[in-house]
Amino acid sequence: MKRTPLRRTPMRKKPSRKPPMTSEVYETVMGRRGGRCEAHVATKCTGRAEHWHHRQLRSRGGEHTVENGLAVCHACHEHIHRFPLDSREAGYMVSSWGDPATQPVRIGGLMVILTPEGGYIAAGKKVA
């Protein structure tokens, strides 16, 4: 007995529940260090900000805010996701219960708090 093939229906993408990132937030983060990589963790760091990294991942409730974003190069972005424990210690990743606005992050050897205006406030902890 010959079977008739099932008709395939196209997959539909679920609509996003979160609003899209505004260009103002994107430009503020990407220009915060003059277009340079803020993490500078990998030995192959290109130094050029190519990716917008969410410190608190979107899958963990992270939003498109200036305090939650880092401008990083491709190599550093890969390193951050490949080594989450080290990244969390440096502040490049924030847990789902954490607050990126109050969690310090290592930028240029200093632990700083990211401000909504696109600046830094020293957290008082120098990192070697």
Task: List each model region and its residues.
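Internal catalytic or translocation cores that form aromatic/hydrophobic pockets or channels
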Residues: 74-76
